[in-house]
Amino acid sequence: MISKTEITRDWLPRYTGTQIEEFGNYILLTNFSNYVSKFADRFDCKIKGKGCPMQTATNDSGLSIINFGMGSANAATIMDLLTACNPKGVLFLGKGGGLKQSAEIGRYILPIAAIRGEGTSNDYLPPEVPALPSFKLHKFVSDTLLEYGQEYRTGVIYTTNRRVWEWDEKFRNKLISLSAIGIDMETATLFIVGHANKISRGAILLVSDQPLLPDGVKTQELDKKVTGKFVDMHLEMGIKAMSDIDGKGEEIKHFGY
């Protein structure tokens, strides 16, 4: 019978156009092609995987970035495929909707946990298992955000499979009752599949809209403004954190699973 290792070692290059040995020890994950382009421009490195489902770039210091696409199914796929190269740490640079007044547009959220509303993660671990980041990785990322003078927010993220829900009053009321600080489509899946696969993981989420407010739903114009004003800092902090963690951070995988 073919093993999971055999599958992922064959599929990681197929999905990304990148050979296993070309990935760095630390990985940035994103949903957006412009993050990969900005990374490649900054480090003068080649973008691989054009024409593939996922695109990557890796700098000379051993930091890789991967655009894995949108949604929990893609999040689970990349966290499975990354077992082929066994990274030391993975940091998700995602966007999400702010569900509380304190989660204003342009704020960064460091999620302490995620509610598993997407369903995908149920194929990996029972519903009773909480979706959590790796503490030591998040602790170091927190220090990095403070270095950049960012007054970040922390709290619980609700992860859903629904992209078009803003019109649904019943769903909106459910979100309010859960007291989550934000909503996205990937974080819970990344945390659970990372835990199942013994991969250290974390996330910095950029608040890109406030969908519970009357005029807060993301539009093309709003997304363009958020991208122009906040994305460079988002990427910069991710690069800084995952570049420095080997030398400055505590060992992030010193414990046994």
Question: What is the predicted role of each segment?
Answer:
Residues E128-L178:
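Active-site rim beta-loop-alpha module in soluble metabolic enzymes
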Residues F140-Y148, V193, M237-I245:
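Generic non-transmembrane alpha-helical segments
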Residues W165-E166, F191-V193, Q210-V217:
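Short active-site-adjacent structural elements
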Residues L213-Y257:
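His/Asp/Glu-rich mid-to-C-terminal helical/loop segments that flank catalytic regions of hydrolases
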